[in-house]
């Protein structure tokens, strides 16, 4: 019995689904035993019954039932009792034969009835339009997951306007998004509010773009836009700005606390309403609620600091708060001039600058900055130095890097850790102060350096969750000027954290995709050797690898051998050779060794030296013999030929001693055995003599 389209449509309802299931199951059930024949009864004729529903016009005229004889109504009580008894018996006997669409559903428990989620609370002092607006967006437009943010405490107010109230809603699809935004704009227009909807495609505009897209796809065939490319139609986000309600354009006089006139101007009054409509994926990607909540939190913290509610020593900077992990310090580049970030709020009075000063004692400075250029400076001098001078900040950060790298491991861990009371250490307070108001690229490079340093020290607090927060912050702040090397370092840090469960590996893969997405959004290639090598190198450095990690490693190794990528650098090849040699994966070791010839590139002296050193360290006669026979011959045929350096000669001698232990002694005594040809024919004796003959001009 096949399912008809009508049955499939009916399966959308839970009750219909259950009834349809009974209908299908009944066809496979065993036949029921025949029921006993009931005693025949003489029943009175029943009133005619029809399932036809008359129209209003037909209801106005007498029905056919009204013209029927009222004999059934005049039957004696005895006949009615017999009819009721017969009906009851018939129902009991043939209840199972009633079709499902005539059966009465059981009453539903109140807890199973779907109730719409509650609407967000309206803040006090909101405009009168706020409550009907929330109801319209929820009930009429059908937006899900409504959230209302009260951003009226942000000081100074954002560019959207003063006293911002922001409503968020999730649309079910792209079409639902545009239709809902268009209806919202028209609804507001009927109430005298002119709203501006950024990202909205009007009805005619959307149809025109769809026609053009279909025509272009027909002309291009399969060579059109790739999946996921920007087609100019899919936005996923519409910002409906209602403007500032209650705005006054009257100029007024401002007076200070003493009643003295301090100026004239237009007051910032009224409330700005903004409705953010997004699809579910776009809302998760942008995370605007988190962004605006962070802006509000930082504004309140800044106001509390100015008012003296927080201690000055607990200084943190957002979004430049240090969170980190690391590998090796790298120098920070100076911009060469003092630039200010446009998204920063600067203090305009000396009193506010004093409130933001770093409160560290001279003893702490002497301890933390021992051996630095500014070790004997006073706290006020350090604070003035770190005020706005970008070059001085960069120089101080470089000295801090050198200082941290010179410390023993225990002291370095203490420098990047929190104190017992939960406050940052003196080193971290100075670091936070130094990166404040730096250009975005330099600030992020400094923060990533601290992250690498903490990861190299295996700091317990710098785990995968903290690294995920840092990556999310980079996405929100738009770290567009960070170099590609820093993103590759982030990938190394992600997979260098040991994970023993499949869930942890999946989280690592998700974070790595966030980093790769940031690279892709900058227009850079993502499937390149630096990215693939960073992931493989980090995965192979972890000892315990769950099945998900092994599967991920296999996928990246397939990319290494099959993807069409540009030729890797010398350092990338050497790192892969080292990591495969450490794990004794010699087949993959030699596959990496052949990458340069595939790109018609010459292998360098460093690469040959690395191969000979790794083979000699393995101390295996067969491997040493094969390496000498293959690699030495290839070395002579490189264009131009590879010269034998002192380090390479030392590694080659070690390989020859492993392949033929007597070759060295025979080669040294060859002058005494010049008449004996058997020693001259030995393969590695000739190689020893050749190498020492070439070492004089190749060293």
UniProtKB/Swiss-Prot annotation:
Its main location: mitochondrion. The keyword NADP does not apply. Residues 53-63 have a biased composition (Low complexity). InterPro entries: Atp25 (IPR040152), NT_sf (IPR043519). It comes from the Eukaryota. Residues 46-95, 310-341 are annotated as: Disordered. GO terms for cellular component: mitochondrial inner membrane; mitochondrion. It is a peripheral membrane protein. Residues 314-335 have a biased composition (Polar residues). Residues 1-31 form a transit peptide. This is ATPase synthesis protein 25, mitochondrial. It comes from Neurospora crassa (strain ATCC 24698 / 74-OR23-1A / CBS 708.71 / DSM 1257 / FGSC 987).
């Amino acid at each position: 019995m096949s399912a008809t389209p009508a049955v499939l449509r009916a399966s959308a309802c839970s009750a219909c689904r259950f009834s349809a299931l009974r209908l299908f199951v009944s066809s496979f059930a065993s036949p029921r035993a025949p029921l006993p024949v009931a005693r025949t009864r003489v029943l009175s004729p029943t009133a005619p019954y029809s399932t036809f529903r008359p129209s209003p016009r037909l209801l106005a005229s007498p029905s056919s039932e009204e013209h029927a004889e009222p004999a059934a109504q005049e039957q004696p009580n005895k006949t009615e009792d017999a009819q009721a008894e017969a009906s009851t018996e018939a129902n009991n006997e043939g209840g199972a034969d009633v079709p499902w669409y005539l059966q009465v559903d059981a009453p539903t428990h109140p807890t199973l009835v779907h109730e719409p989620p509650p609407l967000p609370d309206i803040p006090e002092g909101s405009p009168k339009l706020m409550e009907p607006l929330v109801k319209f967006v929820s009930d009429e437009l059908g937006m899900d997951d409504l959230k209302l943010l009260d951003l009226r405490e942000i000081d100074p107010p954002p560019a959207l306007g003063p006293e911002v109230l922001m409503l968020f809603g999730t649309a079910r699809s792209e079409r639902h998004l545009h239709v809902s935004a268009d209806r919202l704009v028209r609804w507001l227009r009927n109430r005298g509010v002119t709203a501006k909807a950024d990202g909205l495609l009007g009805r005619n505009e959307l149809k025109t773009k769809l026609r053009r897209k279909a025509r272009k796809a027909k002309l291009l065939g399969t060579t059109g836009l790739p999946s996921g490319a920007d087609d100019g139609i899919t936005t996923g986000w519409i910002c409906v700005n209602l403007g500032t309600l209650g705005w006054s354009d009257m100029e007024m006089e401002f007076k200070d606390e003493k009643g003295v006139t301090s100026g004239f101007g237009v007051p910032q009054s009224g409330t700005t309403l903004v409705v953010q409509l997004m699809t579910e994926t776009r809302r998760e990607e942008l995370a605007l609620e988190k962004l605006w909540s962070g802006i509000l939190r930082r504004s309140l913290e800044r106001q509390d600091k100015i008012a003296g509610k927080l201690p000055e020593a607990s200084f943190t900077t957002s979004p430049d708060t240090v969170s980190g992990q690391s590998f090796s310090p790298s120098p920070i580049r100076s911009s060469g001039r003092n630039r200010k970030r446009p998204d920063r709020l600067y203090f305009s009075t000396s009193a506010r600058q004093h409130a933001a000063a770093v409160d560290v004692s001279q003893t702490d400075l002497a301890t933390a900055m021992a051996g630095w250029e500014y070790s004997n400076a006073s706290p006020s001098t350090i604070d003035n130095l770190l005020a706005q001078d970008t070059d001085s900040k960069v120089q101080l950060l470089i000295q801090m890097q050198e200082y941290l790298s010179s410390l023993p491991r225990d002291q370095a861990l203490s420098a990047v850790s929190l104190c017992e009371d939960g406050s940052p250490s003196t080193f971290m307070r100075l670091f936070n102060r130094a990166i404040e108001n730096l250009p975005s690229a330099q600030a992020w490079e400094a923060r990533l350096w601290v992250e690498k340093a903490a990861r190299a020290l295996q700091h317990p607090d710098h785990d995968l969750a903290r690294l995920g927060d840092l990556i999310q912050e980079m996405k929100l702040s738009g770290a567009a000027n960070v170099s590609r090397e820093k993103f590759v370092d982030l990938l190394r840090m992600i997979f260098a954290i040991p994970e023993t469960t499949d869930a942890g590996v999946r989280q690592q893969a998700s974070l790595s995709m966030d980093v790769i997405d940031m690279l892709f959004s900058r227009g850079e290639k993502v499937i390149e050797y630096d990215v693939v090598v960073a992931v493989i190198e980090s995965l192979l450095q972890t000892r315990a690898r769950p099945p998900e990690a092994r599967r991920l490693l296999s996928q990246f190794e397939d990319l290494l051998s099959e993807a069409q990528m540009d030729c890797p650098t010398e350092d990338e090849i050497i790192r892969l050779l080292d990591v495969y040699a450490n794990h004794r994966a010699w087949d993959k070791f030699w596959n990496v060794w052949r990458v340069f010839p595939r790109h018609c590139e010459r292998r360098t002296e460093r690469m040959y030296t690395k191969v000979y050193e790794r083979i000699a360290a393995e101390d295996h006669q067969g491997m040493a013999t094969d390496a000498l026979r293959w690699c030495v011959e290839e070395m002579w045929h490189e264009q131009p030929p590879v010269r034998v350096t002192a380090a390479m000669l030392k590694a080659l001698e070690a390989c020859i001693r492993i392949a033929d232990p007597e070759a060295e002694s025979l080669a040294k005594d060859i002058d005494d055995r010049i008449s004996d040809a058997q020693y001259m024919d030995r393969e590695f004796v000739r190689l020893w003599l050749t190498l020492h003959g070439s070492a004089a001009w190749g060293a």
